[in-house]
Amino acid sequence: MRLKIFFIVCLSFLSLVCSASDVVWYNGKSPVNYSVCEQHDKVVDVALDLFSSDMQAVTGRYANKKSNSVIEIYQLDRLSNKEFGQLSKYSIPINKFITQPDAFYLANTGRKVVVVGSNGRGTAYGILELSRLAGVSPWIWWGDVRPTSKEYLIMKDGYKSLQIPSVRYRGLSIGGEDWTLRPWSKTLDHRLPAGAIGPRTYKKLFELMLRLRANLLWPADDLGTTPFNRVKGNLEVADSCAIIVGSKDPLLRDDKVEWGSRNGEYNNADNHRWLQHYWEEGLKTAGTGEKMFTVGLGNFAILGARNEHDKRQLLQKTVHEQLKLIKKTEDKLNKKNKNAPADYPTLIIANDEVRSLLGNGLQLPDATTVLWPDDGYGYLLPAQGHLSANRKGAEGVLVHLSYQGTPHDCLWLSTPQPGLLVSQLDAALARKANRVWIAEIHEPKVAAYALSLFFDKAWNTSSVTSDHLERHLTSWLSAQFGQTLGQRLLPVMREYYRLTAIRKPEFMGWNQLTSDKDNPKVNDTEFSTDDFGNELERYLSDFRALKNRVDELSQEVPAPLHAAFFAAVAFPVKAAEAMARKQLCAQESREISRPGTFHHDEEALEAAAASLDAYDDLCSLSRQYDALGGGKWAGLMNMSPRNLSVFASPSLPDNLSQKERRQYGVGMELNSQLDAENATAATAAQYDHFSGMITTVPLLGHSQRAVRMAAGSSVDYNFHLSGSGDALLYLAFVPVRPQSNGSMRVSVCFDGGKPIDIDLACPQGTDEWKKAVLRGQLLKKIPLAVDGYRSNHTLRLTAIDDGVMFDQWMIDFVDDRTFYMIPTK
């Protein structure tokens, strides 16, 4: 009787919220049902399994396949004539997307919820779009984001959504997995030998990629990792999930592991026969699924050539031979495969040597995509102007969300500023690099928002712009934690991105790596304890306030989302804060202490105890991460990737006794008062006038409001100076690279004087580039003479070239001041 009353109440409620033409696809009584066309790809079944599980999480009951269901699912390229006839009764604009790979249409039509995909992937994306509409986050498994239960699910009258991907190939690259993904994978593939990442791990990764609408994988390929194709089941699970398999190295090989000294030189001139055999054998083991082939000579130097002309000829010959080898091998493998791909997409990575040759007449087939990489830290390298202007073939970009290399690894947290990611992808679009986009990460969980942002942008390039970036972040946070908490978390994440832009946690050791085997000691930071009111403690104070705010908001998180909140918000904020506290308090202790007096100096002991407490906090946070979900993520978050010195226990004047730890470990008092006497500073966005095309980019730069400037645009500032005489003008820029003609220049004019031109090109590998990458700013310094008879002053900065990202400026009358942060509020 009670159950009957409940259903009557539910039906009464539905009648109030639904119009006659709305479609109720879950009514609170029966499980969600669907029908699907008879012939469809395996990936559709994978998506339906995910959808069924999603519905169980939302409604308490798994979705079922059933004829004459309210949800109808069609895969256009596998339909029978009868099924086409059934579909024709609905008003669906099939001609707009039938030839578009991976596209789908979802609509309330004919009192049905109809999902139509152009191919298997498109159909799968359409099915999982229903999960999104039901409130299921793509991070339901990887992020432990449990959806809110629903009493009913309705598709409103008139709802229709046609989605066609902007970028054809949307890829994920795994790199730096030695310390994270690979050891964690043993929790899923525990029977596999050391070094192998197996099909259970990749299945979970591919399911995430389906939810994010990524379709291309460059598998994990670090030196200790077994090549993807050698692990039984990996190719099969990729095929079942319709994931295109590619590789960083040529022709689906893993050169770091598979090319040994026994093979001789990686030299296609003098060792041609063996290289051809090596590549052909690799192709034979690559299976019959979809593939994308990297061509060229990878990261090896082009050997066997005496000069640039010979290098160019040899590389052109190599690519030509590789394309013939690909066609020969693939045609043979797919001879009996009626679903064989119609073409074999290829790309070449424009590393330094290839870029140089592209600028000197290297000819590549138009069918081969040129993939422009970033510098490892999110700043796209310049394209070759001749290639971009004259080549008909497609282009793409590779963006790192984490990185192993010089000047320092980023393999712990993933802290790319959203504004940088979007602005660089917009730069790629401006130069028509929109065929292939690949994001590299050491493991996906730590980069949940960055990956969501990247693949949302790749799916629909106009859906995420600088103007709406904070709205996108708020929407993502709300999708994970609910609208109220999501809105409250926006300022938290804004501040997190600001503080980690000032210095990434991995860079807090203030040292540089010169090779993979290098591990230099930790140095003192450039944060001053004397100037601008102790900027070291001010930075720590800001981090402390942020951590406290996270603790406050954690009390509002529903119990089912505790694990999700910890991993996505609490852990990164608290870990970054603890790293800063560990290093900066240790530095204060070293600076305060004098030889022989350390154990009698309360200030030095307090700072040392605070540093040790921070290290203990890092250990505790890592243990909490390992314990999430009953050990589900054990091994994924390593607190000391590659055992670099920045992650070690703090370097202090001497050891503290347990008694000293208890006595002085009560927390330091922090001086957070800003004192900018004799200096005037502002953010770039605080201009009084502007001309030309400029855009303020949120979540970018130390200011979090960097100004993107087109060639010929200018910004003007009017201000008062209290001093006169000699001064220094500091100009801070986001260290993006030239994108058009290889140059990036600005001119600056103070008080209407003669303009001074400044070169911002900052070539990769130079000391200036290394410092700029580590600082997150390119800092330029210009001497000024300030007229004491003027009370009001002006500053004009003009972009000579496109792409300038202006961040902050300061005029300082103290010529020997030591500081790290420009003191803007």
Give residue ranges: language-model regions.
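Contiguous, structured surface segment used for ligand recognition
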Residues: 21-164
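The substrate-binding groove and active-site-proximal loops of carbohydrate-active enzymes
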Residues: 114-117, 178-198, 215-225, 259-274, ...
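An acidic-aromatic substrate-binding cleft motif
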Residues: 139-194, 200-220, 393-396
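C-terminal non-catalytic alpha-helical accessory regions
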Residues: 146-150, 473-637, 713-715
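Gly/Pro-rich turn-and-neighbor structural signature
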Residues: 153, 222, 229, 237-239, ...
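Structured mid-domain segments that build the active-site/substrate or prosthetic-cofactor binding neighborhood
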Residues: 210, 215-218, 225, 372-378, ...
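C-terminal amphipathic alpha-helical interaction region
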Residues: 604-676, 690
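Extracytoplasmic
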Residues: 646-825
